[in-house]
A protein has these predicted regions:
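Active-site neighborhood of HAD-like aspartate-dependent phosphohydrolases
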Residues: 1-49
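Short, solvent-exposed loop/turn segments at secondary-structure boundaries
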Residues: 19-22, 59-61, 100-101
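Glycine-centered loop/turn motif at secondary-structure junctions
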Residues: 36-40, 80-81, 120
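A metal-dependent, Asp-based hydrolase signature
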Residues: 50-93
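Soluble or luminal CAZymes and related metallo-dependent hydrolases
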Residues: 24, 64-68, 101-108
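Substrate-recognition element of Asp-dependent hydrolases with the DxDx(T/V) motif
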Residues: 88-104, 109-126
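Alpha-helical elements of Rossmann-like donor-binding domains used by nucleotide-donor carbohydrate transfer enzymes
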Residues: 27-31, 71-75, 111
């Protein structure tokens, strides 16, 4: 049998977990609404969430995810306009992830990664 040369990790729930922190999540919602020029934060977030479901189905069916601009331009906020979206799409994606909660490396995760790396394994993230 061939020797194992590499190890791939899945970030979500394997190396990284999401902690629900309501204050953090609310700040992210407010920031998203600000970036989009919307005053009704909850209505805006609800709209984005509703639009995210068809995108997620598409992404799973295509086995790929859209880049930040494509995500917001084609799926989540096409009415914002190309120029504005190009200026804010990366932060919008970041804030949308923060709406779900704070992400942390799992306990012992860093030590596992360092140990595998020091033993010569190639490491990857899926």
């Amino acid at each position: 049998m061939d020797k194992i040369k590499g190890v791939f990790f899945d970030l979500g729930g394997t190396l990284r977990i999401v902690e629900k922190v309501p204050e953090h999540q609310e700040r992210a919602k407010v920031r998203m609404a600000q970036l989009a020029g919307r005053e009704d934060v909850e209505a805006f977030i609800n709209m984005v969430e509703a639009r995210y479901e068809p995108y997620r189905e598409w992404a799973l069916g295509e086995n790929r995810e859209a880049g930040d601009y494509e995500l917001w331009h084609q799926w989540l906020l096409p009415e914002l306009g190309e120029e504005r979206l190009r200026a804010v799409c990366h932060e919008m994606t970041y804030q949308y992830r923060q709406v779900k909660g704070l992400r942390h490396v799992v306990e012992g995760g860093l030590q596992v990664i360092r140990g595998l790396y020091e033993r010569g394994y190639r490491l990857g993230i899926i």
